[in-house]
Curated annotation (Swiss-Prot):
Keywords: DNA damage, DNA repair, Nucleus. SUPFAM superfamilies: ATPase domain of HSP90 chaperone/DNA topoisomerase II/histidine kinase (SSF55874), Ribosomal protein S5 domain 2-like (SSF54211). GO terms for cellular component: cytosol; mitotic spindle pole body; MutLalpha complex; nucleus. This protein is involved in the repair of mismatches in DNA. Disulfide bonds: none annotated. Belongs to the DNA mismatch repair MutL/HexB family. The lineage of its organism: Eukaryota, Fungi, Dikarya, Ascomycota, Taphrinomycotina. This is Putative MutL protein homolog 1. The keyword Ribonucleoprotein does not apply. GO terms for molecular function: ATP binding; ATP hydrolysis activity; ATP-dependent DNA damage sensor activity; mismatched DNA binding. Transmembrane segments: none annotated. It is found in: Nucleus. It comes from Schizosaccharomyces pombe (strain 972 / ATCC 24843) (Fission yeast).
Length: 684
């Protein structure tokens, strides 16, 4: 080649430089969204909304409620290397913000048409600006490029339209809007999990419902459950590594890790370092090696980690998109994390599950095996669940005559005595000899906002794992009638449950769902409300008893219509609610039911408080009483077992929603499992 014909070296045009740089930073819509979310977080936003069209290729928009952008800063907003985050290179060692180069918005403006609407809290109106190739441009032909006043709320709205309109090769490579939307959804989910103090919404243009909506009221664990489902959330364990637990000064880590029983299609690592979403190949490999010691081949894991270290130990100026960072003592940090991970996995080693092994066909059956579409699967007997909650019990197959000969019917149970120091003997005897008539009334339709609100509270308080255990359990038997403990099996686990506390939630939820449609137990001998009140509260203050009686008499229409509690004008109780014809409450608790309706327990003048308080009192009235050691004879225990097996536990399985409080108080507690029992007895 002729030397003179060679192209000469010359500096590139600034516009070409900017487009090349933009291609490095903004590879796809996902990168633009990441940069804009981080800008919103830097601005102190507590609410971030993402709007997308065609996966962000035609339109992407970020709306936040942050501090906003000053009017004087708008001309420099999309100019390269213009930033408010640092003044000199040494500031990188003390960086507390996400942005620092001043390249994100500049890069977006070189490959898209950018519109910004922003307002400070002190401004009387918002400002609207349009940018092309890093500079202000007129919003419409003939207009001034200067920002224009407009209506708007505090914060900033940044819209980028027609992404890569001037980079045809990149635009032709990104044709799948659904794939881009999926990537952005995953990105927003990760930021939402980490920033639990910020609300995130992600929505497609034209959709009425957001594809992702996570409130700032949700904790990190709740957001993981919402995004990945209860199956993933139930296998997560807290991870915490304080500053004193590592040899690295100023280093700490927290998050969630999956236990040895976790299984999913693929592993998932969400890593934040100093609140930056980053990738670390070294840390990922270290985690995989640690999990490999405890998991079977092909198993997966879920890890969310937030690492915090001194800014001086972190180098964020490594990659154009800032997804890769370098930090000091990376080996020591990885070792500390993996050691802690190993400790947690060892403690949860009993939760490990093993894959089912396909049976290897013999040589003689090879041809048959090849032609078969399904392979025989072997289940190890220490993991073989031999029970099914849908199976009929042996007792249900026996005749009624046989059951009557073996034990008395639960409906004829002798009423226990009221154990109260100040009890009234005549009233107590009336309760003991109480005769009732069952009346089931036709259903009414009652539509109250307070009841809907209480029903919503029950649903929002649901503990998914505990509810699944109750929904799919197999009743085993009564353990301790004195402490109201029974045993159930769920899959390979054996659990003990406090059926007393669970009964309260069952009957309270029945009160809510059947509100205004209860049956009646009509008392053949009406009881004095004053006498019932005095059994619990004593008869020293007659004025309180009379005042309470007048209150119930004045509310007798409401009590009758809503709760099937019948009170005469003379202050006599003639009927109490019947929640189920298959179950009779312990009528010796009637004094406590009446006493629980006093104004000291709830506000009679507030509709929601009043209805809720009465339903709670009815639920407590229906809870089965514990049997004392003196009363624990064969007859009483058989009657209780019949009640548990034939009514209560089938109802737990059918309709109860277990609140988080019950699980936290260990009212449902796993005591062993089939693999553990097999290790002891070598048979199941």
């Amino acid at each position: 080649m002729d030397v003179n014909s060679r192209a000469k070296i010359r500096p590139l045009d600034q516009l070409v430089i900017n487009k090349i740089a933009a291609g490095e930073i903004i590879e796809r819509p996902e990168n633009a969204i990441k940069e804009l979310i981080e800008n919103s977080l830097d601005a102190g936003s507590t609410s971030i909304d993402v709007l997308l069209k065609d996966g962000g290729l035609k339109l992407l928009q970020i709306t936040d409620n942050g501090s906003g952008i000053q009017y004087d800063d708008l001309p420099y907003l999309c100019q390269r290397f213009s930033t408010s985050k640092i003044d000199n290179f040494n500031d990188l060692q003390h960086l507390q913000t996400f942005g620092f180069r001043g390249e994100a918005l500049a890069s977006i403006s070189h490959v898209a048409k950018v519109t910004v609407v922003t307002k400070l809290s002190s401004d009387i109106h918002a400002w609207k600006a349009f940018y092309v190739d890093g500079a202000l441009a007129p919003i419409s032909p003939g207009m001034s490029p200067a920002p224009q006043p407009c209506a708007g709320k505090q914060g900033t709205v940044i819209t980028a339209e027609d992404l890569f309109y001037n980079v045809r090769s990149r635009k032709s490579a990104l044709k799948n809007g659904s794939e881009e939307f999926r990537r952005i959804m995953i990105l927003v989910q990760k930021y939402a999990i980490h920033n639990d103090q910020v609300s995130f919404n992600c929505k497609k243009v034209g959709d009425t419902v957001a594809s992702l909506s996570l409130s700032s009221r949700l904790s990190k664990a709740d957001k993981i459950r919402h995004i990945y489902g209860p199956r993933v959330a139930s296998h997560l364990r807290d991870f915490s590594l304080g500053e004193g637990q590592s040899s690295i000064v100023g280093f700490s880590a927290n998050g969630f890790i999956s236990n040895a029983d976790f299984q999913d299609k693929k592993s998932n690592l969400i890593l934040f370092i100093n609140n930056r979403l980053v990738e670390s190949v070294e840390l990922r490999h270290a985690l995989e090696e640690t999990y490999a010691k405890y998991l079977h081949k092909g198993a997966s894991y879920f890890v969310y980690l937030s690492l915090n270290m001194s800014p001086e130990q972190l180098d964020v100026n490594v990659h154009p998109s800032k997804r890769i960072v370098h930090f000091l003592y990376d080996q020591e940090i990885a070792t500390s994390i993996c050691d802690k991970l190993g400790e947690i996995l060892e403690r949860t080693d009993t939760e490990r599950s093993y894959p089912l092994q396909a049976m290897i066909p013999s040589i003689s059956n090879t041809k048959n095996a090849e032609s078969s579409s399904q392979k025989a699967v072997r289940t190890y007997e220490n993991y073989l669940v031999r029970t099914d909650p849908r199976e009929r019990s042996i007792k249900s197959m026996l005749s009624d005559n046989f059951l009557q000969r073996s034990s008395n019917n639960y409906d004829n149970e002798i009423i226990e005595k009221v154990d109260s120091a100040n009890s009234n003997k005549n009233a107590t005897n009336d309760i003991k000899d109480l005769q009732t008539e069952e009346i089931v009334e036709e259903g009414n339709s009652i539509d109250l906002e307070s009841i809907k609100s209480l029903q919503k509270q029950v649903i929002n308080s649901m503990h998914v794992l505990a509810t699944n255990i109750l929904t799919e359990h197999k009743y085993v038997g009564l353990v301790c009638p004195t402490r109201r403990i029974a045993a159930v099996q769920h899959n390979i686990g054996l659990y003990v449950v406090d059926y007393g506390k669970l009964s309260y939630h069952l009957f309270y939820q029945i009160c809510l769902t059947e509100f205004g449609n209860y049956g009646e137990f009509v008392l053949e001998t009406p009881l004095s409300i004053s006498d019932l009140f005095e059994i619990v509260n004593g008869d020293e203050d007659k004025s309180e008893s009379e005042k309470f009686t007048r209150l119930l008499v004045s509310r007798r229409d409401m009590l009758k219509d809503y709760f099937s509690i019948s009170v005469t004008s003379g202050g006599l109780l003639t009927a109490v609610p019947m929640l189920s014809p298959k179950y009779h409450p312990p009528f010796e608790q009637l004094p406590l039911l009446i006493s629980s309706l006093t104004p000291k327990f709830f506000d009679w003048l507030d509709e929601k408080s009043c209805l809720n308080g009465i339903m709670k009192a009815i639920a407590k009235f229906y809870v089965p009483l514990p049997l004392s050691y003196e009363e624990s004879d064969v007859k009483s225990i058989r009657s209780l077992e019949s009640c548990l097996e034939d009514y209560l536990f089938p109802e737990f399985r059918r309709r109860v929603i277990c609140p988080k409080k019950v699980f936290e108080e260990k009212c449902i507690y796993q005591i062993t499992s089939l693999p553990r029992l097999y290790n002891v007895f070598e048979r199941c």
